[in-house]
Amino acid sequence: MEEPPVREEEEEEGEEDEERDEVGPEGALGKSPFQLTAEDVYDISYLLGRELMALGSDPRVTQLQFKVVRVLEMLEALVNEGSLALEELKMERDHLRKEVEGLRRQSPPASGEVNLGPNKMVVDLTDPNRPRFTLQELRDVLQERNKLKSQLLVVQEELQCYKSGLIPPREGPGGRREKDAVVTSAKNAGRNKEEKTIIKKLFFFRSGKQT
């Protein structure tokens, strides 16, 4: 049962070796630093050694050769460490995938939550930010608030009209205006109508609805 994967890995390694042979050692220099392997480091070492040998046997070339070898050893160590870290991450990823699959198989009650329906929800009673009112209750509260706000605006406009003198102040029960109320009822009715019209105009002007 395990032979096919081994054969596939061998085939992949064979393909990589063929590609490396076709490209040659120079192909290692064109790779990204994150894609380098130990074989690529060996190819780079071969290229640099060949170039140094072409320079001759000058003592300075020999000293430079030792430095280049040291740098290549450091590069090889970094590449090997990166490869090991990558393999560890892949193994951890596969392990986590298996754990997630196992948890999904062991937790079928999650399907029960879907059966609540589109118009239902689960509320945590210990959550201080949980919803405490229904949507209809909030709508009623907002409607009542807007109604009271409009009434307050009317009262404020009427008070402003009294203060500015647009509406004359009313006298008390013992005043002359109340004594002559029967005689001047028609005038008062017309005046009250005019006062309401002024208040209405002022209110609509404040609301941006002047007629």
From Swiss-Prot:
Domain RH1 intervals: 24-106
RH2 domain boundaries: 130-201
Keyword match Cytoplasm: yes
SUPFAM superfamilies hit by this protein: RILP dimerisation region (SSF161256)
Modified residues (Phosphoserine): S107
Coiled coil, from the record: 70-164
UniProt GO cellular component terms: centrosome; ciliary basal body; cilium; cytoplasm; cytosol; intracellular membrane-bounded organelle; membrane
GO molecular function, one term: small GTPase binding
Lineage top rank: taxon: Eukaryota
Record field: compositional bias (Acidic residues): 8-21
UniProt key word 4Fe-4S: no
Compartments in which it is found: Cytoplasm, Cytosol; Cytoplasm, Cytoskeleton, Microtubule organizing center, Centrosome; Cell projection, Cilium
GO BP term, example: cilium assembly
Tissue: Widely expressed. Expressed at higher level in lung.
Region spans: Disordered: 1-32, 166-190
Swiss-Prot/TrEMBL keywords: Cell projection, Cilium, Coiled coil, Cytoplasm, Cytoskeleton, Phosphoprotein, Protein transport, Transport
Biological role: Involved in cell shape and neuronal morphogenesis, positively regulating the establishment and maintenance of dendritic spines. Plays a role in cellular protein transport, including protein transport away from primary cilia. May function via activation of RAC1 and PAK1.
Entry similarity comment: Belongs to the RILPL family.
Subunit and interaction comment: Homodimer. Interacts with RAC1. Interacts (via N-terminus) with MYO5A, the interaction is required for its role in dendrite formation. Interacts with RAB8A; interaction is dependent on the phosphorylation of RAB8A on 'Thr-72'. Interacts with RAB10 and RAB12; interaction is dependent on the phosphorylation of 'Thr-73' on RAB10 and 'Ser-105' on RAB12.
Name of this chain's protein: RILP-like protein 2
Organism per entry: Homo sapiens
Underlying gene: RILPL2
